[in-house]
Regions:
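Rossmann-like NAD(P)(H) cofactor-binding subdomain of soluble oxidoreductases
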Residues: 51, 58-124
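NAD(P)+-binding Rossmann beta1-loop-alpha1 motif at the extreme N-terminus of oxidoreductases
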Residues: 1-51, 56-59
Length: 124
């Protein structure tokens, strides 16, 4: 499978590592610490754990355009704004929420936020 993961924090990086070890093609979207992560391949929140070389770290969702699945490992409080900003990359593919809780402003669960952008929504 071709998988994109938005969010290179602890959870997103861990998910990317598991899928890469399973032989899947992985693109890990890291807009905030892209250069550091490319240089060290060590996510800030995972200690000394290195990301497998098979993971392609990208700074733009445009590089994820052809991937089949998009896992969103961003905090629930940032999910709605992330989706609005990246709307064009969310349609026509399954979206998998990798976050917990509800949006404090709207009271919406991650699945409800994502359902505004795709009819194919799941929660991990």
């Amino acid at each position: 499978m071709k998988i994109s993961i938005a969010g290179a924090g602890a959870f997103g990086s861990a998910i990317a590592s598991v899928f890469a070890k399973g032989g899947h093609s992985i693109k890990l979207f890291s807009p905030t610490n892209f250069k550091e992560l490319c240089a060290t391949r060590v996510p800030r929140k995972l200690g000394n754990i290195k990301l497998p070389a098979e993971i392609d770290i990208v700074s733009s969702l445009e590089k994820n355009e052809k991937n089949e699945y998009l896992f969103l490992a961003v905090p629930t409080q940032n999910l709605a704004s992330f989706c609005k900003k990246n709307k064009s990359f969310l349609t026509d593919r399954p979206l998998i929420a990798c976050c917990k809780g509800v949006d404090q402003e709207t009271g919406l669960r991650p699945s409800e936020i994502l359902s505004e952008y795709s009819s194919k929504v799941a929660v991990m």
